[in-house]
């Protein structure tokens, strides 16, 4: 069903490098951190791994050579492929088996905490644990690329406008969180994520803000195209 759990052989990884978003070395580093996989048909697998290291699911996506999504090929969940592989076409049985998801990159929270804890014990003059700030974007592609350009943040991705929910922000509650929604002409994404942020703040006391960067800086034409942070920063 897929060749390996980790790798840079997907069309996505090749496109990221060939279009100048990352160097080969940066792509290798990002692929290892995010544990990118590759399917047998060349799709990239964005594994969703929680803070315990458990793989909850994986999203298989397809990209064109210009590093934009191949809209002729719909994203697929690994869990759905497995269900159909083992259960055939039993629609009712497949529908009865739940799937669980988290933000793409959630496992980085645990790795960050371990690194910071090591720093604490290596410096006898300081015993305070400082966690990294977390940036949440919509697309996995955006998180992967910006993680190499702005490493001061831990970059996580919701995987879609409506995939961001307050409960998925619970593991982030001890971090400062900045949400970077995509832009659009009607403030739909910003408004939606603002409401999610408010709910997370109410439920978990999250230190969370929604960045207005794209709403304040994007041109009307860019908003019409519904650009994201990578589109704006690279202006390709």
Residue ranges, per PLM feature:
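Phosphate-handling DNA/RNA-contact segment within nucleic-acid enzymes
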Residues: 45-173
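Short, conserved catalytic or adaptor-binding loops enriched in Gly and charged residues
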Residues: 24, 85, 128, 199-202
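TOPRIM metal-binding catalytic domain and adjacent DNA-binding surface shared by DnaG-type primases
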Residues: 1-56, 235-236
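Hydrophobic transmembrane signal anchors and adjacent membrane-proximal interface regions, especially
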Residues: 4, 14, 36, 93, ...
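Aromatic side chains
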Residues: 2, 29-34, 63, 74, ...
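Intrinsic-disorder-associated interaction segments
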Residues: 5, 20, 75, 93-96, ...
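TOPRIM fold recognition
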Residues: 51, 68, 114, 134, ...
């Amino acid at each position: 069903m897929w060749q390996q759990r980790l790798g840079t052989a997907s069309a996505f990884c090749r496109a990221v490098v060939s279009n100048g978003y990352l160097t080969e070395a940066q792509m290798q580093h990002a692929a290892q951190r995010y544990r990118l996989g590759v399917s047998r048909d060349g799709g990239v697998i964005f594994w969703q791994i929680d803070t315990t290291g458990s793989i909850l699911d994986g999203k298989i996506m397809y990209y064109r050579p210009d590093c934009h999504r191949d809209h002729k090929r719909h994203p697929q969940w690994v869990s759905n492929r497995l269900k159909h592989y083992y259960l055939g076409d039993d629609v009712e049985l497949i529908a009865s088996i739940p799937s669980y998801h988290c933000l793409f990159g959630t496992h980085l929270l645990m790795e960050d905490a371990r690194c910071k804890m090591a720093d604490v014990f290596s410096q006898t003059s300081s015993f305070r644990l400082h966690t990294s700030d977390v940036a949440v974007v919509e697309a996995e592609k955006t998180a992967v690329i910006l993680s190499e350009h702005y490493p001061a943040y831990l970059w996580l991705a919701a995987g879609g406008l409506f995939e961001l929910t307050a409960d998925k922000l619970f593991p982030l509650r001890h971090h400062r969180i900045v949400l970077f929604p995509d832009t659009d002409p009607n403030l739909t994404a910003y408004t939606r994520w603002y409401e999610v942020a408010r709910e997370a703040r109410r439920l978990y006391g999250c230190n969370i803000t929604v960045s207005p960067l794209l709403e304040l800086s994007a041109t009307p034409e860019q908003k019409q195209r519904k650009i994201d942070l990578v589109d704006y920063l690279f202006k390709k």
